Amino acid sequence: MSSLKIITRMFGIELEFFLLDRYGNTVNTADRVLGFLKRKNLKNIAVRKECGKSMIELISFPHRSHRHLFSDFFKDLESVLYETNVNDLNLFCLGTYPGKNSNIMRSDKRYISQEKVLGNDQFRNAGKCCGFHYHYTLPRNTFDH
């Protein structure tokens, strides 16, 4: 048996969504959605606010396996889809919303800082696009050899 420590890498995903009403319009109800999803027993993901009040973000917890990462994520995503549907909302992800975007930007300290760095116009653009982020963490001590 080798005396070397097991080297692990970690994977994670983030998926951002616009919230839409039954007519396909963006709605600024993220705080309400976060409230009712907080009461659900989501074991594999965290639901977070985004820079706009018509957006939410689903974040996986770090995994060592691609297979478990995605299967666990989609189990909880199914619950999120069910809850938003029951509350007469739809999720729209990956890209920019094609209609009129009435997104209200947040004024938390974190977002005020981003606005100062990016400028008002560029910061507002952040509230007009949603994406998918796939994170890969290199094994610890990768560059120490």
Predicted regions and their residues:
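Terminal catalytic/cofactor-binding subdomain
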Residues: M1-Q122, K128, H145
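An acidic/histidine-cluster motif and surrounding catalytic segment
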Residues: Y134
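Inter-helical turn/loop segments and adjacent helix faces that build the functional surface
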Residues: L138-H145
